[in-house]
UniProtKB/Swiss-Prot annotation:
Role, per record: As part of the heterotrimeric replication protein A complex (RPA/RP-A), binds and stabilizes single-stranded DNA intermediates, that form during DNA replication or upon DNA stress. It prevents their reannealing and in parallel, recruits and activates different proteins and complexes involved in DNA metabolism. Thereby, it plays an essential role both in DNA replication and the cellular response to DNA damage.
Protein name, UniProt field: Replication protein A 70 kDa DNA-binding subunit
Lineage summary: Eukaryota, Metazoa, Chordata, Craniata, Vertebrata
Any Pfam family: Rep_fac-A_C
Gene, per the UniProt record: rpa1
Swiss-Prot/TrEMBL GO biological process terms: DNA recombination; DNA repair; DNA replication; protein localization to chromosome
Superkingdom in the source lineage: Eukaryota
PANTHER family: OS03G0429900 PROTEIN (PTHR47165:SF4)
Regions recorded as binding DNA: 189-273
Length: 609
């Protein structure tokens, strides 16, 4: 089979300013360049059959071609998109953004023709170069095709190839370049990009002083990058920059990116300095929105802990907002756990924080896309939103439309399999629904570790005897105190005496559903949810009005709840029995419960039960 014909003269045409060609070239050599903490960069010596040039640089998103031996010495490829980058010393680098291997190296015997090194900057381009290189003779149909009509490349030409020039403060001019071409060796550059994420101003104080900062993430057609403004620049730019707006960014400092806490796909990150300018851009229709690289939920189990990644899923259900205190700064923040499911039927527990947690509404089961969530192994596999993450509800992207269509047509009756909890794991999301009969017939709790399940059941009996006790009043201690009979109460754990105490609840309850019953132990929060009163009030009621105290327990009987239960086989005095503990008690979501019953009926009907 004939080899593809090389685009003779293409190198000369590219360096002469032809940005529309799609030349067919041969790889003569590949050299890896160490970039420190970032991924390797590959420098290519390429031939067009007439000349060779060693100034081709492979974009990092194409590294897989070399890593998988698809791109190797002697192979023939077509470069469909590239960027010419001018360095400070006058040299030019051609960054290959898109390419296709047309003929693998093992099918090409060696170097084609007798090409000579191209002398960049030494006189005019060689006359042998045809123009344009991308328009081969009709007799060679295997060669590269003609460039597309200009209208098809309007956005790219407008951004980069068209050579847009921006006036920066001070009267200087700077040419707009793509984000993908930025590197620390450039001095003058401008990018036109959309801000996709903006963090709040954060402050710090240490032995070296104090300061403030905020970070943004921006994207253009070629890629994305993270930028940070410190101190004076933070004050200068914070109110100016808005999410989803497009700006011209000029003259920042570029350095190797720290990828520990961000999923931005760029080897470098930007820092604003005293010369940085940010100018709003009104003509922004062709600048893309957030760029995602979604990882299917089913693949999370094979990813490393602490990986920062993008995820999309339908919100199956959402827990209520809770308040937690961050130990490092003693600051109280909002927290909400939601469960996301994709078309694989896999479910992952995801934690939202702060404003994202407060404002989230999962009642209509929205599509949730998160850019930059961190993966943990707490309770199987779970995700947590970072301060640098972007959370989008029902985003206007094809993946969201596809997921919504799947869920509305068939996904809403899929129960889902959680990867955030496994048999023997910790209590994960609100999944693993079981009837009480299934819990016993499946011998849940008989393994080496505890099992967790969720069930809808009804209170049939509450054991009110000894359900209240007097506990240590210290905030972090719930140990029972001993009445010293002198007006003081002693806590053996704290080794202190107190003039007061607090009431705590340990309530034994018998619950039942349509097929079985189960004794469970309910501690403070769960017991208060069932009784509808807090422990302090119940303690006072028991001391002052025994009849009213009894009525609280009577009124709590025969009420139904959704129980989250931990079961484990435990041994006391050589006798083994299942201990069931209520981890959470919530009112029944009858809409969700009815949906699940309908789903089960359909499953049974399909199985002919």
């Amino acid at each position: 089979m004939a080899l593809p014909v090389l685009s003779e003269g293409a190198i000369s045409a590219i360096l002469g300013g032809d940005s529309s060609c799609k030349p067919t070239l041969q790889v003569i050599n590949i050299r890896s360049i160490n970039t420190g903490n970032g991924p390797p960069r590959y420098r290519l010596l390429m031939s067009d059959g007439l000349n060779t040039l060693s100034s081709f640089m492979l974009a990092t998103q194409l590294n897989f071609l070399v890593d998988n031996n698809l791109l190797a010495t002697n192979c023939i490829c077509q470069v469909s998109r590239f960027i010419v980058n001018n360095l400070k010393d006058g040299r030019r680098v051609i960054i290959v953004m898109e390419m296709e291997v047309l003929k693998s190296a093992d099918l090409v015997k060696g170097k084609i023709g007798n090409p000579h090194p191209y002398n960049d900057g030494q006189g005019p381009p060689q006359p042998a170069a045809p123009a344009p290189a991308s328009a081969p003779p009709p007799s060679k149909p295997q060669n590269i095709s003609a460039p597309p009509p200009p209208s098809m490349n309007r956005g790219a030409s407008k951004l980069f190839g068209g050579g847009s020039v921006v006036n920066t403060p001070g009267g200087s001019q700077s040419k707009v370049v793509p984000i993908a071409s930025l590197n620390p060796y450039q001095s003058k550059w401008t990018v036109r990009a959309r801000v996709t994420n903006k963090g709040q101003i954060r402050t710090w104080s240490n032995s070296r002083g104090e300061g403030k900062l905020f970070s943004i993430e921006m994207v253009d057609e070629s890629g994305e990058i993270r930028a940070t403004a410190f101190n004076e620049q933070a004050d200068k730019f914070f109110s100016l920059i808005e999410v989803n707006k497009v700006y011209y960014f000029s003259k920042g400092t570029l350095k190797i990116a720290n990828k520990q806490y961000t999923s931005v796909k760029n080897d470098y990150e930007m820092t604003f300095n005293s010369e940085t300018s940010v100018i709003p851009c009104d003509d922004s229709a062709d600048v893309p929105m957030v760029q995602f690289e979604f990882v299917p939920i089913g693949e999370l189990e094979s990813k490393n802990k602490d990986t920062v990644l993008d995820i999309i899923g339908i919100c199956k259900n959402a827990e209520e907002v809770t308040k937690v205190t961050i130990r490092s700064n003693n600051r109280e923040v909002s927290k909400r756990n939601i469960n996301l499911m994709d078309s694989s039927g896999k479910v992952v527990s995801t934690t939202l924080w702060g404003e994202d947690a407060d404002k989230f509404d999962g009642s209509r089961q929205p599509v949730v896309a998160i850019k930059g969530a961190r993966l943990s192994d707490f309770g199987g596999r779970s995700l947590s939103v970072l301060s640098s993450s972007t959370v989008m509800i029902n985003p206007d992207i094809p993946e969201a439309f596809k997921l919504r269509a799947w869920f509305d047509s068939e996904g809403q009756v899929v129960e889902g399999t959680s990867i955030s909890e496994s048999r023997g794991g910790t209590g994960g999301g609100n999944t693993n629904w079981k009837s009480l009969l299934e819990v016993k017939t499946e011998n849940l709790g008989h393994g080496e570790k505890a099992d967790y399940f969720t069930s809808v059941a009804t209170i049939v009996y509450l054991r009110k005897e000894n359900c209240l006790y007097q506990a240590c009043p210290s905030q972090d201690c719930n140990k029972k105190v001993i009445d010293q009979q002198n007006g003081l109460f002693r806590c053996e754990k704290c080794d202190k005496e107190f003039p007061n105490y607090k009431y705590r609840l340990i309530l034994s309850a018998n619950i039942a559903d349509f097929g079985e019953n189960q004794w469970i132990t309910c501690f403070q929060e769960s017991a208060e949810s069932i009784l509808g009163q807090n422990a302090t009030y119940l303690g006072e009621l028991k001391e002052k009005n025994e009849q009213a105290y009894d009525e609280v327990f009577q009124n709590a009987n025969f009420r139904s709840y959704t129980f989250r239960i931990r079961v484990k086989l435990e041994t006391y005095n050589d006798e083994s029995r299942i201990k069931a503990t209520a981890m959470d008690v919530k009112p029944v979501d009858h809409k969700e419960y009815s949906r699940r019953l309908i789903m089960n009926i359909r499953k049974m009907a399909a199985q002919g039960v």
